[in-house]
Curated annotation (Swiss-Prot):
Belongs to the radical SAM superfamily. Biotin synthase family. It comes from Yersinia pestis. SMART domains: BATS, Elp3. This is Biotin synthase. Catalyzes the conversion of dethiobiotin (DTB) to biotin by the insertion of a sulfur atom into dethiobiotin via a radical-based mechanism. NCBIfam families: bioB. Its cofactor is [4Fe-4S] cluster; [2Fe-2S] cluster. It catalyses: (4R,5S)-dethiobiotin + (sulfur carrier)-SH + 2 reduced [2Fe-2S]-[ferredoxin] + 2 S-adenosyl-L-methionine = (sulfur carrier)-H + biotin + 2 5'-deoxyadenosine + 2 L-methionine + 2 oxidized [2Fe-2S]-[ferredoxin]. One of its GO terms (biological process) is biotin biosynthetic process. [2Fe-2S] cluster binds at C97, C128, C188, R260.
Length: 345
């Protein structure tokens, strides 16, 4: 059975304090011990229910408390979701994440959510959902449907958390992660850089994640996307090197986890993204939109992959699907790039 290092905030801060090139070298060494450094997991994120969220997360345009111009939408039909998943798979994604702007899912929606999971799984894709807090029963129902991952971010350190969110406690988030893990679903949990937090808060977030009973299999690191109408719309820009440091420290502290470049990539140039991959990032969201905020379009991602010699990671599927994935990989990396589908529209 794998053993995990118990981290302290002081140890995490010591990593943040390292000279950048030394930190990158250490992170790359750790990355190569656990992953193929040329493989990048490609995921698609679809908003299956948008806006009108009762929570007060200060960074989020989906909160009903802020005037951001976002139009709310009801839960998508199962058939619509599966059609989006099919198109995402055809465009090269191997993992399909479905997000709903809820504090927690209603019982009346659970049968539809289960059908979405079952349908996407039938396509040979990994499944992920982010729906807010889950009860024990809800976690087990999603597990029975075949859900692979559940995303529930901690966002920041326990100390800074109350400055950003008051409608859900930090402990509630930890409780949901425990319910997900106990149900046999893999955990996806990370945070946001640029909320106004200190380096110590970033260290505290990573310590919380790394010291879970088992570290998350997937750790999304977001750069704040400032949205007009939210309380954080005038926050200072995130320094690219500080973001890269956070990726590198996450890689060192959670060596077996996928570290995902999530929201904020639209604000990063190619050089910053390349350094993030060098620092140990090995997963991206692929498509023009992450729920309600911009993301680089697919063509740009594939061009960057070609420049860096990176390959989209393939999932374990049937023989026929493996051949299809290989053909897609060749097409994406070496052929003319077609216009790909934006599943999040």
């Amino acid at each position: 059975m794998a053993t995990y290092h118990h981290w302290t905030v002081g140890q995490a801060l010591a990593l943040f304090d390292k000279p950048l090139l030394e930190l990158l070298f250490e992170a790359q060494q750790v990355h190569r011990q656990h992953f193929d450094p040329r493989q990048v997991q490609v995921s698609t994120l679809l908003s299956i229910k948008t806006g009108a969220c009762p929570e007060d997360c200060k960074y989020c345009p989906q909160s009903s408390r802020y005037k951001t111009g976002l139009e709310s939408e009801r839960l998508m039909q199962v058939e619509q979701v599966l059609e989006s998943a099919k198109k995402a798979k055809a465009a090269g994604s191997t993992r399909f994440c479905m997000g709903a702007a809820w504090k927690n899912p209603h019982e009346r929606d659970m049968p539809y959510l289960a059908k979405m999971v079952e349908g996407v799984k039938a396509l040979g894709m990994e499944t992920c959902m982010t729906l807010g807090s889950l009860s024990k029963q809800q976690a087990h129902r999603l597990a029975d449907a075949g859900l692979d991952y559940y995303n529930h971010n901690l966002d920041t350190s326990p100390e800074f958390y109350g400055s950003i969110i008051t409608t859900r406690s930090y402990q509630e988030r930890l409780d949901t992660l425990n319910e997900v893990r106990d149900a046999g679903i893999k955990v996806c949990s990370g945070g946001i850089v640029g909320l106004g937090e200190t380096v110590r808060d970033r260290a505290g977030l990573l310590v919380q994640l790394a010291n879970l009973p088992k570290p998350p299999e997937s750790v999304p690191i977001n750069m704040l996307v400032k949205v007009k109408g939210t309380p954080l719309e005038n926050n200072a820009e995130v320094d690219a090197f500080e973001f890269i440091r956070t990726i590198a420290v996450a890689r060192i502290m959670m060596p077996s986890s996928y570290v995902r470049l999530s929201a904020g990539r639209e604000q990063m140039n190619e050089q910053t993204q390349a350094m993030c991959f060098m620092a140990g990032a090995n997963s991206i969201f692929y498509g023009c939109k992450l729920l309600t905020t911009p993301n680089p379009d697919e063509d740009k991602d594939l061009q960057l992959f070609r420049k860096l010699g990176l390959n989209p990671q393939q999932t374990a599927t049937s023989h026929g699907d493996r051949e299809q994935q290989q053909a897609l990989t060749e097409q994406l990396l070496h052929g003319d790039t077609a216009q790909f589908y934006n599943a999040a529209v």
